[in-house]
Swiss-Prot record:
Protein name, per record: Nucleoside diphosphate kinase
Catalyses which reaction(s): a 2'-deoxyribonucleoside 5'-diphosphate + ATP = a 2'-deoxyribonucleoside 5'-triphosphate + ADP; a ribonucleoside 5'-diphosphate + ATP = a ribonucleoside 5'-triphosphate + ADP
Keyword presence, Transport: no
PANTHER family in UniProt: NUCLEOSIDE DIPHOSPHATE KINASE
EC number(s) from the headed UniProt entry: 2.7.4.6
HAMAP family (alphabetical): NDP_kinase
Positions annotated as active site in the UniProt record: H115
Entry's Gene Ontology BP terms: CTP biosynthetic process; GTP biosynthetic process; UTP biosynthetic process
Function recorded in the entry: Major role in the synthesis of nucleoside triphosphates other than ATP. The ATP gamma phosphate is transferred to the NDP beta phosphate via a ping-pong mechanism, using a phosphorylated active-site intermediate.
Main location: cytoplasm
Cofactor(s), names only, from the UniProt record: Mg(2+)
Alphabetical UniProt keywords: ATP-binding, Cytoplasm, Kinase, Magnesium, Metal-binding, Nucleotide metabolism, Nucleotide-binding, Phosphoprotein, Transferase
One Gene Ontology molecular-function label: nucleoside diphosphate kinase activity
Origin organism lineage: Bacteria, Bacillati, Cyanobacteriota, Cyanophyceae, Oscillatoriophycideae
Length: 149
């Protein structure tokens, strides 16, 4: 079963949107297999956003992610990576469709509430950065028979 990494960023935590975000993923039929509220070290933030290290916003992005707790999550389900990206919406909340998390709650690119892995390979890398295997629970929700053929 496919897995993805989702992080509710400091602005989402501070605005009290954790339950709303989790509810949307649950309503979509995905299974939560890892969850933790945590303060992010500068080293972890830099490693996570390594792909952006040459971009002018890298320093402020790292500083922002370290500024307040985040909620790190691993979700599981058929096609969860692509489906989660649609649920999250465009990076710029002003371009995000209504009904998406960013479209409904996002304010600006720099405060766009949530991060989601953009590919299966990226998800695997990010999950291993934020979680060890013992922190992930494999379980079978009873609703699964009502979601998948």
């Amino acid at each position: 079963m496919e897995r993805t990494f989702i992080m509710i960023k400091p602005d989402g935590v501070q605005r009290g949107l954790v339950g709303e975000v989790i509810g949307r993923f649950e309503a979509k039929g995905f299974t939560l297999v890892g969850l933790k509220l945590m303060s992010v070290s500068k080293e972890l933030a830099e490693e996570h956003y390594d792909v952006h290290k040459e971009r002018p916003f890298f320093g402020s992005l790292v500083e922002f992610i370290c500024s307040s707790p985040v909620v790190a999550m691993v979700w599981e389900g058929d096609g969860v990576v692509a489906s989660a990206r649609k649920l999250i919406g465009a990076t710029n909340p002003l371009s995000a469709e209504p009904g998406t998390i960013r479209g409904d709650f996002g304010v600006s690119v720099g405060r766009n509430l949530i991060h989601g892995s953009d590919a299966i390979e990226t998800a695997q890398r990010e999950i291993s950065l934020w979680f060890n295997e013992k922190e992930l629970s494999s379980w079978e929700p009873t609703a699964k028979t009502w979601l998948y053929e």
